[in-house]
Amino acid sequence: MTTGSIHNAAPTASDTYSNFADLAAHEDEGLHWTRECRRVPGSDLAHIAIHGGHIEAGTTEAALACAGSADNYYSFKGIKTGANRTLHVTSTDFDEPQCVDLQSGMARTVSWHGFSGGDKITEVGGLDHDFSYWITVSLQHAGFPVAEAAPERAGSSPLNICNRNLAGRGVQLELSRAQRAAFFMNNDMSGGNRNNVTAEFHRYVEAIQAAYRRLRA
């Protein structure tokens, strides 16, 4: 298990910043980004969205809803008027202190992500294979297309923030743009519409929560 900070000399090729400290030195909290962290005593499950807000739209909303009032929640949110992609720090480099500290006390983690794609699909990755199994079964039972994560989205590195918990393993969910858009009225993922969730959103959330109940049964 790795819980300390990551110090990279250079960012991942597709990223602007190498880690959180690099980002925070160039982007202003409250103006360009915010972070939310809610801890629930007695819960050892965290739903995290490290590319939330306008970075990978819909991931913050999914993480928050799935955590509900019972489980822990974290989101790093892009709030810029444009170019929020510059706030993306890849999962193996993400070391924002509140998230790292939360993860250090968790036995289970679901890390929420988005990727481009015109077909509805959820790719399931990470190192927590037991939880991944039940999430896959539960989503499929609810009618959602599911696939094993593509290699570039597999979440298999021990340095991935989803795996940096007490168990050294978590689940990484990659939701296509089409799937995330279906969570909001008129497929509109703009910031002003992301409070207007659909029945499909609620069905998806229930499937994830049901998977955790089955895991613990």
Where do the model's predicted regions map?
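N-terminal catalytic or cofactor-binding beta/alpha core of small enzyme domains
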Residues: T2-A217
